[in-house]
Curated annotation (Swiss-Prot):
Keyword Endoplasmic reticulum: no
Source organism of this protein record: Mus musculus
Region (Disordered): 469-490, 617-690
Keywords: Coiled coil
Coiled coil residues, start to end: 300-603
Coiled coil among keywords: yes
Protein name: Coiled-coil domain-containing protein 157
Compositional bias per record (Low complexity), positions renumbered to this chain: 639-659
Listed Basic and acidic residues bias regions: 469-482
Length: 718
């Protein structure tokens, strides 16, 4: 058998066998329903879901590849085993359904993976069970036939009928109902039990009778044929849609299998259900594809609309550019016309110069004849001629320098005018030289003594003529260069105009941004000034709170506690540090004040006032009352706190209902606490009034300070 491996005839035979096996399996599935067992060839897939068409197309005979052909032959053999095993499993399921009198079992999950031997044993056991049932039913069938023939004899001329025909006559399959599955053609044999009771009613016998099948049916159901015809047409449309969209079609593969197995026969119910499932798969695939296409088409439409808008804008820009180009072309035409006019003028001037040079040549020939006669006198004058040549060279160098300076001074736009001016200047020089030549001829004719000067002037004229020729050629070359420079300048001017427009737009935007930034800076400066004022006020308030803690609310009420205890303690530590710093400064001031008071007391300038003169008469009879605001202000001046009236009125102090203020530093008798004035004792401070003395001492020590703010009584708000 090894030499047959890869043979095309063997592979074709196996392919035909696989096609027949698959058709038989589909027929069994249409009667017993699909069985879901793992495939023997592909254990990870269900056997009934294998795509046999794709497998047969893939594993085929390839003439140029013997290895793949042998592999395909082996795979086809394995597929034959797989299909035979699936056929045995489906037949076993069909036999089980016959034994339990149920043709279409309910849907069930995939079964376990079974070997070939186990599947064959199961099939044989089911077949034996069916044989036993049939053997048990045969004697009952014979007994029933005998009882029917005894109890109900046949009429004359009427043929004897079997019990199967009698039961099939009265027991008919149900009529097809629209909307239900088409099972009228899928049932090949439905067992029906008919119970016949004996006259005595003591025994009950049953018998299996088979109903009408597809092969024995005389007329097929019209509704089924019409529905299946429309189903075929819809399937063709769905397959064509999938092919047009380059999508795989599950229904197409299933349709090929149905055509190969059933042809044009009516489809059974299970096949119709499988058909509907495959068709729904294709429809869902088409729906997803259409959804993806709509998602792609949406942004493309938006991009198309944007492109059309941009196209309109570009058309407008092109029209504007065409208008600008036409204007520029008109300007260039006008400029070329002007250049042609100037060129014609230059040509005319050149012709005039040529005619004049011809006249000069004739005159020079005449003069040369005269010069031949006067050669003897010329030789004597050669030294002077050399000097004149040097002067001529200097003159030419000076003229060249003048020309260079003129070229540097003139602008690029006026070089053409400069060239024309040079040509005119050359013509005027020629006129002058003509006059000089005429005068020289007249002088030569009239005065021979001036012959030497004429010869010198003649040499100068020759040199100037040559220089004029060279200058004329240079002027023509300069004119061509100036034309090229003019064109380049025009292009540069256009570019500079474009750059100027862009810079102007940029300048406008920068100015707008500058104005916005100036507005923002002014707003920020205002906010900064306000914040600085608030900061100064808060600093002043903090200093007052630290300096006069007794005049304000308790510290426990002022501290706003947060959820973080450590943060509150840190804030309290910072406040205490600030308070300690301020108190240290106050201690220094008080120490300096005490030193000054001691110095004044030692000098004898401090006077003691009796205690009886301290208080005014209205306050003598009140016990526990505080002294007037003047004494309180003097006492506050003793501490060295030089506050303005506004800052002192801003502090909050406690006031009795009677209008008299009390301080926690006061004694119960209404007198201030003890003060150590220099070396004075406690008895002296009690008997004398030190407040007025301190006030007088303060006035003596600070005469320039305003005393009104110290003695003016102030009312603190309650």
């Amino acid at each position: 058998m090894a030499h047959l491996l890869g043979s095309q005839a063997c592979m074709d035979s196996l392919r035909k066998d696989l096609t027949d096996l698959q058709g038989t399996i589909v027929d069994v599935f249409s009667r017993a329903g699909p069985v879901r067992f793992p495939s023997w060839k592909f254990p990870d897939r269900v056997a009934c879901d294998l795509d046999m068409v794709a497998l047969l197309e893939h594993y085929d005979h390839v003439p140029g590849d013997p290895e793949f052909t042998q592999l395909s032959h082996a795979v086809l053999l394995e597929l034959v085993i797989d299909r035979l095993l699936l056929l045995l499993q489906s037949c076993a399921s069909y036999l089980e359904n016959l034994s339990v009198e149920q043709m279409m079992p309910p849907a069930r999950a995939a079964g376990p993976c079974m070997s070939v031997g186990l599947t064959v044993r199961r099939f044989w056991s089911n077949l034996l069970r069916l044989g036993l049932l049939y053997q048990q039913a045969v004697p009952q069938k014979r007994a029933n036939q005998g009882e029917i023939s005894i109890t109900k004899p046949t009429a004359k001329g009427e043929p004897a009928r079997s019990p199967e025909c009698m039961t099939a006559k009265f027991i008919k399959p149900p009529s097809p109902v629209p909307g239900l599955p088409l099972i009228c053609q899928g049932l090949q044999s439905i067992p029906v039990r008919v119970s016949l009771r004996s006259p005595g009613g003591t025994s009950e016998k049953t018998k299996s009778v088979y109903s009408q099948t597809v092969e024995t049916a005389l007329v097929p159901c019209d509704a089924c044929t019409s529905v299946q015809g429309s189903l075929w047409e819809v399937g063709k449309v769905v397959i064509s849609l999938c092919q047009s969209q380059n999508l795989p079609s599950s229904l197409g593969q299933f349709q090929k299998l149905v055509k190969d197995s059933l042809g044009l026969k009516p489809l059974p119910a299970a096949t119709v259900g499988h058909w509907a499932a495959e068709q729904s798969k294709d429809l869902t695939r088409l729906n997803k594809h259409v959804g993806a296409l709509t998602q792609l088409v949406g942004p493309l439409r938006a991009q198309l609309e944007d492109a059309e808008g941009q196209k309109d804008g570009l058309r407008k820009q092109v029209s504007k550019l065409e208008q600008a180009l036409q204007q520029e072309q008109g300007q260039r035409q006008r400029q070329t016309e002007e250049a042609e006019r100037t060129l014609a003028k230059c040509e005319h001037d050149r012709h005039q110069l040529l005619t004049e040079t011809c006249d000069l040549k004739t005159k020079v020939a005449v003069l040369e004849g005269d010069l031949k006669q006067q050669q003897k006198s010329i030789q004597a004058m050669e030294a002077k001629a050399q000097q004149l040549e040097e002067e001529g060279e200097r003159r030419a160098a000076a003229e060249r320098q003048v020309q260079q300076l003129e070229e540097q001074v003139q602008l690029l736009a006026g070089r053409l005018d400069g060239a024309s001016q040079q040509i005119r200047w050359a013509s005027t020089e020629l006129d002058k030289e003509k006059a000089r030549v005429d005068s020289m001829v007249r002088h030569q004719e009239s005065l021979q003594a001036k012959q030497r000067t004429l010869l010198q002037q003649l040499d100068c004229l020759d040199q100037e003529r040559e220089e004029l020729r060279g200058s004329l050629d240079e002027a023509e070359a300069q004119r061509s260069e100036l034309e090229e420079q003019l064109q380049s300048l025009q292009s540069d001017r256009e570019q500079e105009q474009c750059q100027l427009q862009a810079q102007q737009e940029l300048l406008q935007s920068l100015q707008q941004e500058k104005q916005d930034l100036e507005q923002v800076t002014t707003d920020l400066q205002l906010t900064i000034s306000e914040l600085r004022q608030q900061l100064e006020e808060l600093k002043e308030r903090e200093r007052l709170l630290v300096a006069f803690p007794d005049l304000h609310q308790p510290e426990e009420a002022q501290i706003q506690s947060s959820s973080n205890v450590t943060q509150d303690m840190e804030r309290q530590v910072q406040a205490n540090a600030i308070r300690i710093q301020v108190l240290q400064e106050e201690n220094k001031r008080l120490q300096s004040m005490l030193t000054k008071i001691r110095e004044v007391a030692q000098q004898g300038g401090l006077k003691m006032v009796p205690q009886g003169q301290l208080w005014s008469p209205p306050y003598k009879g009140i016990q526990g009352a505080t002294p007037p605001a003047q004494a309180q202000s003097a006492f506050s001046g003793l501490t060295g706190r030089r506050q303005s009236p506004g800052s002192r009125t801003s502090s909050t102090g406690r006031t009795h209902p009677g209008g008299l203020r009390t301080s926690p530093s006061r004694q119960p008798g209404g007198l201030p606490s003890k003060f150590s004035l220099g070396d004075g004792s406690h008895s002296a401070s009690c008997t004398q009034n030190p407040i007025r003395a301190l006030a007088r001492l303060r006035r003596k020590l600070s005469p320039n300070r305003q005393a009104g703010s110290t003695y003016q009584p102030q009312e603190r708000p309650t």
